[in-house]
């Protein structure tokens, strides 16, 4: 169950950068 974690981590990074 690492796919969800990775997705969340990447999503958080993108949001922080301001990239949709």
Swiss-Prot record:
Localization annotation: Secreted, Extracellular space
Gene Ontology MF, one: lipid binding
Major localization listed first in the record, in broad terms: secreted
Top-level taxon of origin: Eukaryota
Tissue: Secreted into the hemolymph.
Keyword terms: Hemolymph clotting, Lipid-binding, Secreted
Biological process annotations from GO: hemolymph coagulation
One GO cellular component term noted in the UniProt record for this chain: extracellular region
Function: Involved in lipid transport. Plays a role in hemolymph clotting. May be involved in wound healing in the cuticle.
Entry protein name: Fibrinogen
Protein source organism: Pacifastacus leniusculus (Signal crayfish)
